[in-house]
């Protein structure tokens, strides 16, 4: 699923690039593809019926596991940081290479790398289990640090950009494939919805977070906020590591 999502992004980015040659507003026509997809979904996807839905139950309201809210926060931060990297990359690259530099070619590679990383998720997750999550976060920390120190160094900037595409392709599938371990069957759908809402919140607040990180560094350097983001994910890595190991020792 994750790989197909990245493939769809690649195709639609390409179509938007073709349409923008007609008119910049024409590029927004790519969103129209949602209508036939919605129609296909409505006509072909069957309703999911719980076999036990007809069995009378004591309707006791279940409490959501606090771990779910931690995952929502993680989703917010992960998407926020990913969007910040994509948005700020063009400005940093232009500062290094000059105003005539076209950053879109490198950004177009991101979904392709996401596809490759997505296909690798299954074997890696089978091999190292929860280490997949740790490794994804470590790659994100390295990505942020490389971008943070890439002032004038295009190699560091590109390496950081490409590494950032791995994290989402590994962390989100890991979270969703293990969500049933922290929720019940009655709350898993709501928990999934909350995580997706967290992704949208992260997308929305990315520019605000970038400005706040820039303010905290007291620097006008375009790469400065990524030191803050790297620090945040270092904390997340330690919290995740100790929380999962504490749970396993019980």
Q: Which residues does each PLM region occupy?
A:
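A membrane-interface helix-boundary motif in multi-pass transporters
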Residues: 18-32, 212-233
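A late C-terminal transmembrane helix in Major Facilitator Superfamily
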Residues: 180-219
């Amino acid at each position: 699923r994750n790989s197909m999502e990245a493939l769809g992004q690649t195709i639609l980015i390409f179509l938007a690039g073709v349409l923008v040659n007609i008119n910049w507003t024409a590029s927004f026509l790519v969103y129209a593809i949602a209508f036939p997809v919605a129609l296909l979904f409505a006509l072909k996807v069957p309703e999911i019926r719980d076999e036990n839905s007809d069995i009378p139950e004591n309707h006791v309201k279940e409490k959501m596991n606090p771990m779910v809210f931690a995952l929502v926060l993680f989703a917010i931060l992960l998407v926020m940081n990913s969007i910040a990297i994509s948005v700020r990359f063009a400005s940093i690259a232009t500062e290094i290479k000059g105003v005539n530099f076209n950053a879109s070619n490198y950004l177009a590679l991101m979904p392709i790398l996401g596809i490759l990383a997505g296909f690798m998720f299954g074997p890696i997750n089978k091999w190292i289990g929860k280490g997949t999550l740790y490794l994804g976060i470590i790659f994100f920390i390295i990505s942020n640090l490389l971008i943070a120190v890439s002032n004038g160094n295009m190699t560091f900037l590109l390496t950081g950009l490409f590494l950032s595409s791995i994290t989402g392709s590994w962390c989100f599938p890991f979270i969703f494939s293990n969500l049933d371990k922290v929720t019940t069957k009655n709350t898993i759908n709501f928990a999934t919805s909350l995580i997706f809402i967290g992704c949208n919140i992260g997308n929305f607040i990315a520019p605000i977070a970038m400005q706040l990180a820039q303010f905290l560094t007291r620097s006008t350097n375009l790469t400065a906020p990524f030191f803050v983001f790297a620090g945040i994910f270092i904390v997340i890595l330690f919290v995740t590591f100790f929380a999962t190991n504490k749970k396993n020792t019980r």
